[in-house]
Curated annotation (Swiss-Prot):
Stored InterPro entries: DUF1508 (IPR010879), UPF0339_domain (IPR051141), YegP-like_sf (IPR036913)
Keyword tags: Repeat
Gene for this chain: yegP
Domain of life: Bacteria
Pfam entry (one): DUF1508
Similarity comment: family membership: Belongs to the UPF0339 family. Duplicated subfamily.
Transcription listed as a keyword: no
UniProt name for this protein: UPF0339 protein YegP
Keyword presence, Repeat: yes
Sequence repeat positions: 10-58, 61-109
Length: 110
């Protein structure tokens, strides 16, 4: 099954999206946006940037866990991954975003 985006609205009227893999696992979480239109632009940015290896910033948290940020051409963070135990599992997460990030399916939960 192909991945999809889920768009949601928080209790303080901000918007965020997540990218889900085909198995339902969240593989990328956006920053908060003040408008739905901005969040939708963020989804469009994931679609255009996720296939490009150079858009992934690989990081290590202070607790030793691994994660990545997907960045736009202007170096702004579009979304961040979960924490991974190993660098290899982080690479698997990046590969999943590359495959699922071009999805045209958006489940609007706003």
């Amino acid at each position: 099954m192909a991945g999809w985006f889920e768009l949601s609205k928080s209790s303080d009227n901000q918007f965020r999206f997540v990218l889900k893999a085909g198995n339902g696992e969240t593989i990328l979480t956006s920053e908060l946006y003040t408008s739905k239109a901005s969040a939708e632009k963020g989804i469009a940015s994931v679609r255009s940037n996720s296939p490009q290896e150079e858009r992934y910033e690989k990081k290590t948290a202070s607790n030793g866990k691994f994660y990545f940020n997907l960045k736009a051409a202007n170096h702004q963070i579009i979304g961040s991954s979960q924490m991974y135990a190993t660098a290899q599992s982080r690479e698997t997460g990046i590969a999943s975003v590359k495959v699922n990030g071009t999805s045209q399916t958006v489940k609007d939960n706003t």
